[in-house]
Amino acid sequence: MVRAQWKVIILLILLMVIPSDGLFHSIYRSILVAQPFKGNAGQPLFLSPYIRTGKIKEGQRKSMVSPFPGMYDKSYAGYITVNQTYNSNLFFWFFPARTQPADAPVVLWLQGGPGGSSMFGLFVEHGPYIITSNMTVLSRDFPWTFSLSMLYIDNPVGTGFSFTDHIQGYAIDEDDVAQDLYSALVQFFKLFPEYAKNDFYITGESYAGKYVPAIAYYIHSLNPVRRFKIRLKGIALGDAYTDPETIIGGYATFLYEVGLLDEQQRRHFRKQCRKCIKYIKEQEWMKAFEVLDELLDGDLTAGPSFFQNVTGCTNYYNILQCTEPEDQSYFSKFLSLPQVRQAIHVGNRNFSDGAEVEKYLREDTVKSVKPWLAEIMNYYKVLIYNGQLDIIVAAALTERSLMTMDWKGSYAYRRTHKKIWKIFESDDEVAGYVRRVGKFHQVIVRGGGHILPYDQPLRSFDMINRFIYDRGWEPYKL
């Protein structure tokens, strides 16, 4: 035990001193904070007027999050207006890195869903705080904010604390998502110009496997022609639903081989998946969505999905867990507390479960962004990672998609073998497996599921820092 604790301490020291060289919706549907508890929640803070009028210091000062018992990291939060016509606003919460914040890369985190709040990533996965059942705030052992400046945005409009006053303010495709995010990012870096010079990475998991390539491609396209440039260096995608057609085509075999379907159930699953793919090829997007929803997701159906009926499980994020862990929803009650809402400047705004967001993105659900991802892989650093125990976007399904990708390194990728990754040379346990081709890194993390940093916090922490700080995948020596 003592030796293990020393390894953790050494890893943190290494990070400071080594130079750099919706669809998946069930977990979010249980997280609904319709109204705050009674009390003074203050008023929502809209920062775009301060940005437009050049009142940057005042905007920064007003957006600073007030101290709350257990929450002592310096942070900023508020709303950025991305469409004045429809009064569409994206909520953000920004944490400068604990170490060397002036130079640390800025990392945007986007949750999946569609319609999952990035507050889930903050409180459940890799932010500085954990919420207990009695609303106590604890410090996370391996927060990504230790070495990275983390920007959490509730995306798209209508997700979490983000909102719009008009139905036309909702995104109906990834172009809409990217356009709103780009507006928010440009305004964010104008509000915090001291961070605009830092390297910028876009990260996310699950359905954000669409959001991340979409906004990255948008930045890639606009940077050459815009005066204000975002210093995009790379992206990281966890268990990413980037390429639905290819992923859906592998479900029946995968679920059968891990023992979740019998032979008859596999035949039904395969038949329905083929029907879904047929609709995708015919661009019958709504029909494809309905087939997949009845088969697997059960988000908008009257009863359980076929998957839920035959497995008895509602959780397809970890093969070892039939239901979602209870502690993954504690933060929702915390965000109802008026003193918390006042501290993060959201006032009495509803915290949405994202059902409306998914409704407007139903056709987008089965569309691919693979061409955008391939373009990003040609020019930027890219990390694609999977938890070994994930079901909904299993490692085998990600690899199935990657084998069909057309990018500059595709020939080399298909002929490159994965290598063993350990954090420390003396570790008995293997952290995972890595396949690297140039600036592209594919990682499978052992012992983790879809919500990877929750299942494997240290391995996720080590992985993201190795990738962003270009430290390679050789084990550290004690």
Curated annotation (Swiss-Prot):
Active site residues of this protein: S206, D390, H450
Glycosylation positions in this chain: N83, N134, N309, N350
Signal peptide coordinates: 1-22
UniProt-listed GO biological process terms: proteolysis
Annotated keywords: Carboxypeptidase, Glycoprotein, Hydrolase, Protease, Signal, Zymogen
Function: May be involved in the digestion of phagocytosed particles in the lysosome, participation in an inflammatory protease cascade, and trimming of peptides for antigen presentation.
UniProt keyword annotation of Hydrolase present: yes
A Pfam family hit: Peptidase_S10
Gene it is expressed from: CPVL
Gene3D superfamilies reported for this sequence: alpha/beta hydrolase
Family classification: Belongs to the peptidase S10 family.
Species in which this protein is naturally found: Rattus norvegicus
Lineage, broadest ranks: Eukaryota, Metazoa, Chordata, Craniata, Vertebrata
Name used for this protein in its record: Probable serine carboxypeptidase CPVL
The EC number(s) this enzyme carries: 3.4.16.-
Record carries keyword Signal: yes
Molecular function GO terms recorded: serine-type carboxypeptidase activity
